[in-house]
Amino acid sequence: MNRLYPHPIIAREGWPIIGGGLALSLLVSMCCGWWSLPFWVFTVFALQFFRDPAREIPQNPEAVLSPVDGRIVVVERARDPYRDVDALKISIFMNVFNVHSQKSPADCTVTKVVYNKGKFVNADLDKASTENERNAVLATTASGREITFVQVAGLVARRILCYTQAGAKLSRGERYGFIRFGSRVDVYLPVDAQAQVAIGDKVTGVKTVLARLPLTDSQADPVSQAASVETAANPSAEQQQIEAAAAKIQAAVQDVLKD
């Protein structure tokens, strides 16, 4: 759970549909008995589609998490169309049996949200990234890296829901959106990001690590930095012995040259 979404297990976007299906199923059951079976099947399908279970979230600062459940359909170097820079592109396709809530792949601050109208071709196709209805979130991670994650509507999905805006701070795994009934999410990362998945891999939202973003020296673990400084300031006994031996050799060479 998080501060913006305190209702796990069943996504709130599905409450009206599930409630309506349950009421209709009960009504038809009382009137028509077994003829209500299709309505019960629909209600059960809606329950599984709108499930939104709580999950453990990896806290490795280098890890970029999968924002959704699904299957990897793209891992390639591409152009981020929202920043006009080269990037590592990773795309996840969601079928109707996957969890469809979207969650932040990293601790980040949203800098811009861009919505584009478009078509509704099969989200499994490459052209869906540029032709379909889509909503892009441009953000800067806690370590200062720029990332973009894009909700893409699919053949059946006709409504993208995004609950974040420019200036908002998202925690890794924090819920920020939802797409109904099959869709896709594109993630654009800096080119030095190291992909941890391959095409065809099945991923689990916020549990699977899509890629790792290397940290610069200035962003390294302060404990490690302190240890390095201490080592430099206090050389080991072995280092001291080596330096003493080098000084003796240098002195001996100078004596020979004087003679």
UniProtKB/Swiss-Prot annotation:
Annotated keywords: Cell membrane, Decarboxylase, Lipid biosynthesis, Lipid metabolism, Lyase, Membrane, Phospholipid biosynthesis, Phospholipid metabolism, Pyruvate, Zymogen
Cellular-component GO terms for this entry: plasma membrane
Keyword presence, Membrane: yes
Enzyme superclass (EC): lyase
Pfam family, any one: PS_Dcarbxylase
Cofactor note: Binds 1 pyruvoyl group covalently per subunit.
Enzyme nomenclature, EC number: 4.1.1.65
Active-site residues annotated for this sequence: S183 (schiff-base intermediate with substrate)
Single GO molecular function: phosphatidylserine decarboxylase activity
Catalytic reactions of this protein: a 1,2-diacyl-sn-glycero-3-phospho-L-serine + H(+) = a 1,2-diacyl-sn-glycero-3-phosphoethanolamine + CO2
Localization, UniProt: Cell membrane
Function: Catalyzes the formation of phosphatidylethanolamine (PtdEtn) from phosphatidylserine (PtdSer).
Assembly and oligomerization: Heterodimer of a large membrane-associated beta subunit and a small pyruvoyl-containing alpha subunit.
HAMAP family, per the entry: PS_decarb_PSD_A (MF_00664)
UniProt protein name: Phosphatidylserine decarboxylase proenzyme
UniProt organism field: Neisseria gonorrhoeae (strain NCCP11945)
Organism lineage string: Bacteria, Pseudomonadati, Pseudomonadota, Betaproteobacteria, Neisseriales
Originating gene: psd
